[in-house]
Amino acid sequence: MAGYRPDIPPHVADAIRSLPPDVKRGVKAAVRALSGDPGAGEPLQRELDGLWKYRVKRFRIVYGIDRQRRTIRIVAVGHRRMIYEELADRARRR
């Protein structure tokens, strides 16, 4: 079975580049792992229903799974303290 292709928008790639080196390595390794098993994370709830999270130290990768296209769309990468509030605010504004 072929893996899933990661889809990383430019703003998320910029956020990854700005992370500390150890976290950046962890995020890159996590994206590779998620490409092989996108269900390895945990599903989110409420406003973020349909998205998943994956933990890398104090940071979170938030992503969606498109099983038909076999892609994982990385929605955001950030510190756990702020990432969910930012995404929930974005979801409410839609």
Which residues does each predicted region cover?
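Enriched for short, Lys/Arg-rich terminal
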Residues: M1-P6, S18, R25, G64-R94
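Basic/aromatic recognition patch in beta-strand/loop cores that engages polyanionic ligands
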Residues: G39-M82
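N-terminal first-folded block
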Residues: G3-P43
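Short amphipathic alpha-helical "recognition" segments used for binding
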Residues: G26-K28, R32, L51, K57, ...
